[in-house]
UniProtKB/Swiss-Prot annotation:
It comes from Marinobacter nauticus (strain ATCC 700491 / DSM 11845 / VT8) (Marinobacter aquaeolei). It catalyses: [ThiI sulfur-carrier protein]-S-sulfanyl-L-cysteine + a uridine in tRNA + 2 reduced [2Fe-2S]-[ferredoxin] + ATP + H(+) = [ThiI sulfur-carrier protein]-L-cysteine + a 4-thiouridine in tRNA + 2 oxidized [2Fe-2S]-[ferredoxin] + AMP + diphosphate; [ThiS sulfur-carrier protein]-C-terminal Gly-Gly-AMP + S-sulfanyl-L-cysteinyl-[cysteine desulfurase] + AH2 = [ThiS sulfur-carrier protein]-C-terminal-Gly-aminoethanethioate + L-cysteinyl-[cysteine desulfurase] + A + AMP + 2 H(+). Belongs to the ThiI family. InterPro entries: Rhodanese-like_dom (IPR001763), Rhodanese-like_dom_sf (IPR036873), Rossmann-like_a/b/a_fold (IPR014729), ThiI_AANH (IPR020536), ThiI_fer (IPR054173), ThiI_N (IPR049961), THII_Thiazole_biosynth_dom (IPR026340), THUMP_dom (IPR004114). GO terms for biological process: thiamine biosynthetic process; thiamine diphosphate biosynthetic process; thiazole biosynthetic process; tRNA 4-thiouridine biosynthesis. ATP binds at L184, I185, K266, G288, Q297. The gene is thiI. This is tRNA sulfurtransferase. Catalyzes the ATP-dependent transfer of a sulfur to tRNA to produce 4-thiouridine in position 8 of tRNAs, which functions as a near-UV photosensor. Also catalyzes the transfer of sulfur to the sulfur carrier protein ThiS, forming ThiS-thiocarboxylate. This is a step in the synthesis of thiazole, in the thiamine biosynthesis pathway. The sulfur is donated as persulfide by IscS. Its main location: cytoplasm.
């Protein structure tokens, strides 16, 4: 299978040195990710395209396309057939072979490109192929403005290709072509979408989590960060930094006027984030704020919050409404995480200020013990995001079962996108599909007289959740770990 990849339009209009650098980075990202599927996949290209040659007969088409549509910087992916150029009639014949079935009852338009020295123009090619398709198929007709199907052909010197199928990419810039940032992540809708939008823009992002007091919350946020990285950013290594913020929260509640709690908490986070970001050479901070979504997100309050640091603060969601944010979360697969994420609500005032005054906020902060923030920063931990799930602590040891009995029920806890790519099928056992983020809710509703074995590809997620469920009193939960 041969694929033709076009970069996002913004890449194509850059100056030559910038375009070369961005295309080089895009090829490098594609090559690194596809090599995990098969090291024999070839990735080449030129200034305005990337060519991918996938070995046939290895069932790689689906996995390769699935990987490519999630790589930032790609506009379109076309599955193409490549042929030696003979004449226009031959191009028409090949087009009929490729499109006749799909054109039944549909309108179409031929879009042609030509490179090299030929005795015909691109429009001549379009007309010739269009006539062949009208004669050789049951197409409804030609519609140049809004066709049901576009037939894409490109002639280059003494060869040509016909696009069989076209897939839309993420767009944006290749990851790694813009400076690195630090994204403040809570696992909710806003921060996960903000992190995704940064990656889509080509910005490598570390993840910074402020733990306000819940172990379950950190476990959930680790899963979100790992999912985002694995789906959209795994061409680059990044860190997950966790800051124990319980002491800072307690100090705020002791020393600060309750109306300022929310604003001061954000300022403390920003102060800590700015100091930590410098240690990781991050050029900016990313937050998931949207104007007026909550009381601390008025323009006045955001201005007061930003005065806590000299670092640039990026807010990609600033003008989005909540439904738009949730729609993107659904599209990228983080909505179920956010919907089931445990929340910590210890710093919510009954009458939060909406127009904070900087001098009054600073007067409140002066009452705080600076050691609380310094200790939190000093006691932070960091983990490579690629190792996040491996390093998550399991509260209870759980039994691993290689061969289940016929009465055991297997629970596939993988994310639906992973389960669809590689379904689990067993002959002698019932298999339930319960994504890990819905386990806590659904396990309580299962019959208690059965034994349940949790399953995931690597065994890490299943062991972690089985351990948490066992700690909560579910003694009939174990792990299905088939022999490799």
């Amino acid at each position: 299978m041969k694929l033709l990849i076009r970069p996002a339009p913004e890449v194509a209009i850059k100056s030559k040195p910038v375009r070369q650098q961005q295309m080089r980075q895009l090829r490098q990202n594609i090559r690194k990710l596809l090599a995990r599927l098969d090291p024999e996949i070839r990735v080449d290209g030129s200034w305005d395209r990337v060519d991918v040659d996938v070995p046939d007969g290895r069932s790689l088409a689906g996995p390769v396309i699935d990987e490519l549509v999630r790589i930032p910087g790609i506009s379109t992916i076309q599955e193409i057939g490549v042929f030696p150029f003979v004449d226009l009639d031959d191009v028409g014949e090949k087009a009929v072979q490729a499109y006749a079935e799909r054109l039944k009852g549909k309108t179409f338009a031929v879009r042609a490109r030509r490179h090299g020295d030929h005795d015909f123009r691109s429009i001549d090619l379009e007309r010739s192929v269009g006539a062949a398709l009208l004669q050789g198929s049951d197409a409804k007709g030609v519609d140049l403005k809004s066709p049901d199907l576009e037939v894409r052909i490109e002639v280059k010197d003494d060869s040509y290709h016909i696009a069989h199928r076209r897939h839309e990419g993420l767009g944006g810039y290749p990851l790694g072509t813009v400076e690195t940032v630090m994204t403040l992540i809570s696992g909710g809708y806003d921060s996960s979408v903000a992190a995704y939008l940064m990656m889509r823009r080509g910005i490598r992002s570390h993840y910074l989590f402020f733990n306000l007091g819940g172990a379950a919350h950190e476990v959930g946020v680790r899963q979100v960060a790992h999912y985002l990285w694995e789906r959209y950013g795994s061409s680059h290594n990044v860190k997950f930094i966790s800051v124990p913020f319980e002491g800072v929260v307690a100090e705020i509640m002791r020393s600060v006027n309750h109306r300022h709690w929310g604003v001061v908490l954000k300022r403390m986070m920003l102060k800590a984030a700015a100091e930590i970001a410098r240690d990781y050479n991050a050029s900016g901070l990313v937050m998931g704020d949207a104007v007026a979504q909550v009381s601390s997100q008025t323009l006045t309050n955001l201005n007061v919050v930003d005065r806590a640091s000299d670092e640039v603060v990026l807010r990609p969601l600033i003008a989005m409404d909540k439904q738009e944010i949730i729609r993107i979360a659904k599209d990228i697969g983080t909505e179920p995480f956010a919907r089931n994420m445990p929340e910590y609500c210890g710093v919510i005032s009954s009458k939060p200020v909406t127009r904070a005054r900087l001098h009054r906020v600073e007067e409140d902060e002066a009452n705080m013990d600076p050691a609380a923030l310094a200790d939190a920063i000093a006691n932070r931990t960091d983990t490579m995001v690629s190792q996040l799930l491996d390093s998550t602590q399991t509260p209870e040891e759980v039994e691993l079962i290689q061969t289940p009995s016929v009465d055991d029920v297997i629970i596939d806890v993988r994310h639906p996108s992973e389960e669809e790519r590689s379904p689990l099928t067993l002959t002698n056992n019932d298999v339930l599909k319960i994504p890990f983020y819905e386990l806590n809710q659904q396990v309580a509703e299962l019959p208690g007289n059965r034994q349940y074995l949790l399953y995931c590809d690597r065994g890490t997620m299943s062991r972690m959740h089985a351990g948490h469920l066992k700690a909560e009193g579910h003694g009939n939960i174990k792990v299905y770990a088939p022999a490799v």
